[in-house]
Design a protein with these regions (language model features):
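Transmembrane helices of ABC transporter permease
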Residues: 20, 24-37, 41, 48, ...
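Short intracellular "coupling" helices and adjacent cytoplasmic loop segments at the cytosolic face
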Residues: 1-5, 94, 102-126, 130-132, ...
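Cytosolic ends of transmembrane helices, especially the final helix of ABC transmembrane type-1 domains
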Residues: 222, 246, 263, 293-321
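An intracellular "coupling" helix at the cytosolic face of ABC transporter transmembrane type-1 domains
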Residues: 20, 113-114, 130-139, 143, ...
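Hydrophobic alpha-helical segments in the permease module
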Residues: 70-82, 175-182, 248-262, 268, ...
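Cytoplasmic juxtamembrane "membrane-exit" helices immediately C-terminal to transmembrane segments
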Residues: 87-91, 95, 99, 162, ...
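ABC-type nucleotide-binding domain
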Residues: 330, 337-582
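Membrane-integrated ABC transporters
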Residues: 1-39, 54-71, 85-89, 93, ...
């Protein structure tokens, strides 16, 4: 029952999106009616032609030519109607698919970071790409065959009744058995298609992970283990696909067997009727054609039901993404932070990603305007988490963080984040020109401003050596640029914006020592008068910080300037000395 309810709910959502194109749907149904009506008229014309051939006396060639001409005209009009119907069905299907993909991507852009962190990237990609494509295939099949199938059943029934009612009764009684068989099988294939979709998403996620981290895989000679893992996932996908296809493939032969029985019954009873004189040979020929056309849609509809089951499973996964709760909206009275002074305070902040595993327990922070605050500590101590809280990628569980005296939960996220310039250890560059990537935070920047920012970030030199300089097109994630060059472009992006507050999370980790010295000098100029948060593992980069926070297990265990902390001989001193040990 839960599966049936889920199917019903998903179907309603699909129909709701189809309703946006109701004019196309009406035109498709009308053209289907024209196509079916004309197709069903052909057997009558053929029957008349046959009766003209075998009628007593001479063959009526004129009548035969007339009927054949009618058949040619009717067939041509039917073909035109079918062609137009297919165009409309394709347009309607891919408009619905476009809308769903747009909805899914729009929702993805509004999801909280917690969702992105909790779900493999490949699984989400699979929902937006693979599942939508699978859904499109099933929906197109439904449009192209379901409408015409239903109309054909109704039309042939009317025509058969007009020819011979008793034989029609035999057809009507036997044929629906194929629908019961199809329904019986379809109910059992839903769970198999669902498992197939899950296995496909897992495989997509794994392949994407391996492609993105192939250097690490090869560096640690992990190829064999990954091949074994891929083979295991691939085997499960193969098994779930074969099971789904095996059971769904029973549908067509089973319905065809029933329809063959119907055809045989019509031929037998029709022959007796022809001998008895209650039907002409031409009429029997037309009836046999109708019986075949009547049973054919049952075969097609049974196939459509199977495909539609797969489409509904994919639609469920798409709608699950579309209906994910978005990031909590800004408060109705949230203010816009125009240009922050940069006074940041945290009061008794507590936060955890999972309720049973507290990370930050009671953190207090007081950063003055223009102060350079460095955050250090071992991996997993909460440094990046603190940055996430400052940017409101996550909200605190308890306590508060304020900027210029206003709780950041009462500031719009967009305006808060625009006041920060952020350079992360993980670089991100979009496909486009070098210039496009630099001006992301300031689209109206002049050429002089772009070049000045690049010179300050020491990226101008390598940019001018590229084939087309600032107009050089780079691929996704920087293409062939080195990691250091990509990092320099990200730094240039921030240099151009000149925001009042900065976050540098291992910003120079991918840059050689000589370039790092230039960058540190540029950063010193950039940070002048700007509140800055610097996350660093290389402690040599934070000697000039106004305040250093030493974190461990989510708590601040030491704070002070570099020389003070080294003189104390505590945890920071141990970290510092371990990095510079001979």
């Amino acid at each position: 029952m839960p599966k049936l309810k889920a199917n019903s709910s998903t179907l309603k959502k699909v129909l709701g999106r189809i309703a946006r194109y109701r004019l196309n749907a009406v035109l498709s149904i009308l053209l289907s009616a024209v196509y079916v009506g004309l197709s069903l008229y052909v057997p009558i014309l053929a029957g008349r032609a046959i009766d003209s051939i075998i009628a007593p006396g001479s063959v009526d060639y004129a009548q035969i030519m007339l009927e054949l001409t009618k058949i040619a005209v009717v067939a041509a009009i039917a073909a035109l109607a079918q062609w137009l119907m297919n165009i409309i069905n394709n347009s309607m299907t891919y408009n619905v698919v476009k809308d769903m993909r747009t909805e899914a991507f729009d929702r993805l852009m509004k999801l909280p970071l917690s969702y992105i962190d909790a779900h493999p990237y490949g699984e989400t990609v699979s929902r937006i790409i693979a599942d939508v494509d699978q859904f499109a295939d099933g929906l197109l099949l439904g449009f192209s065959q379901l409408f015409t199938g239903i109309l054909t059943i109704i039309g042939t029934l009317i025509f058969m009744l007009s020819v011979n009612a008793p034989i029609t009764l035999a057809v009507v009684i036997l044929t629906p058995l194929s629908l019961f068989v199809a329904r019986f099988i379809a109910r059992r294939t839903h769970s198999m298609f669902a498992r197939q979709g899950e296995d496909r998403a897992e495989q997509t996620a794994f392949v994407e992970e391996m492609i993105g981290n192939q250097k690490v895989v090869q560096a640690f000679a992990h190829e064999q283990a990954n091949e074994e893992r891929f083979d295991e996932i691939n085997k499960r996908l193969s098994e779930s696909s074969l099971q789904a296809i095996f059971y769904s493939s029973i549908t067509n032969p089973a319905t065809r067997f029933i329809n063959s029985l119907v055809y045989a019954a019509v031929g037998l009873t029709g022959a007796f009727a022809a001998v008895a004189g209650s039907i002409t040979v031409g009429g029997l020929s037309a009836f046999l054609s109708y019986a075949n056309q009547y049973t054919k849609p049952f075969n097609e509809i049974s196939g459509v039901i199977t495909e539609f089951q797969n489409a509904l499973v994919c639609a469920e996964r798409i709608f699950a993404l579309i209906e994910e709760p978005t990031e909590e909206p800004d408060a109705s009275d949230a203010c816009v932070l125009d240009h922050a002074e940069g006074i940041v305070r945290a009061n008794a902040v507590a936060f955890s990603y999972a309720a049973d595993r507290p990370l930050i327990k009671c953190l207090d922070l007081d950063v003055k305007s223009g102060e350079r605050m460095a955050i250090v500590g071992p991996t997993g101590c909460g440094k990046t988490t603190l940055i996430n809280l400052l940017m409101r990628f996550y909200d605190v569980n308890a306590g508060s963080i304020s900027v210029d005296g206003t709780d950041i939960r009462n500031i719009t996220r967009h305006s808060l984040r625009r006041n920060y310039g952020m350079v992360l250890q993980e670089t991100w560059l979009k496909e486009g020109t070098i210039r496009d990537n630099i001006v992301m935070g300031k689209p109206d920047a002049t050429e002089e401003e772009i070049i000045a920012a690049a010179k300050e970030a020491h990226s101008h030199g390598f940019i001018t050596r590229l084939p087309k300089g600032y107009d050089t097109v780079i691929g996704e994630d920087g293409g062939s640029l080195s990691q250091g060059q990509k990092q320099l472009l990200c730094i240039t992006r921030v240099m151009l914006c000149l925001p009042p507050m900065l976050i540098l999370d291992e910003a120079t980790s991918s840059i050689d020592t000589r370039t790092e010295q230039h960058i540190q000098h540029a950063f010193a100029q950039l940070m002048q008068g700007r509140t800055s948060f610097i996350v660093a593992h290389r402690l040599s980069t934070i000697k000039n910080a106004d305040m250093i926070l030493v974190m461990k297990d989510g708590d601040i265990i030491e704070k002070g300037k570099h020389d003070e902390l080294v003189a104390r001989g505590g945890f920071y001193a141990a970290l510092y000395n371990s990095q510079f040990a001979q």
